[in-house]
Amino acid sequence: YLRATFGNWNNLTSNLSKAIRKFLFDNEKKEYCKNLFGNPSDAFLSMITSKGIVNVLFEVAILRNKWKAHGGITSEVENNQRVLSLQKQLNELRKYIADAFDETTMLSPTTCSFEDGIFTFNAKQLIGARTPFNEITIKSLIPLDRKKLYLSNSQQTKPLELLPFIKFIEATDAIYFYTSIESKDVRWVSYHFDKEAELKQPADDDLFKAFEFLK
């Protein structure tokens, strides 16, 4: 994953989804598995382990490789046809996601207070393509690191820390995604901030620990 490819991520997604489904179908392991994900809704677990989503991702990878292999100048008709093909896959993806995120959100904690054993955090709610992101207040039984991102379920009080493949840059109010390591720097890309759509930053220990975790 030092030079991540679409195919590698798809294979990882497929393998993890299959493993999680096995845990969820095992009555002795189901609750343990749900707890690892912060006890989200059944709709959320169903979505992230969906065979349908994996199939869509593999289909898009096939299209991408096909178009890349036959590179060169393409006609407007061909370009329009490609857009229609991708829109079809996007609609399929939306169908599988549906309302799975209604009770689960990704957040970036900011300020905090502590009283009677409960942390009260202000946090950026990282939803959608429009910025600036909304600020919300959440209750938590555990401390949250403002340098990290979390998944928070509205019915739970222990947000789930995400692996550091997604980064929120507060100064630009933009989300960046890990793409590769080049020399000693990490390359990040954003779909929010066109003025600086790519970043290169020194790799840190947390990222390498995440790589070890995925082996």
Segments (PLM) and residue ranges:
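Accessible peptide chain termini
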Residues: 1-2, 215
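Flexible secondary-structure boundary motifs
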Residues: 2-63, 92, 185, 196
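Polyanionic, low-complexity intrinsically disordered segments
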Residues: 46-215
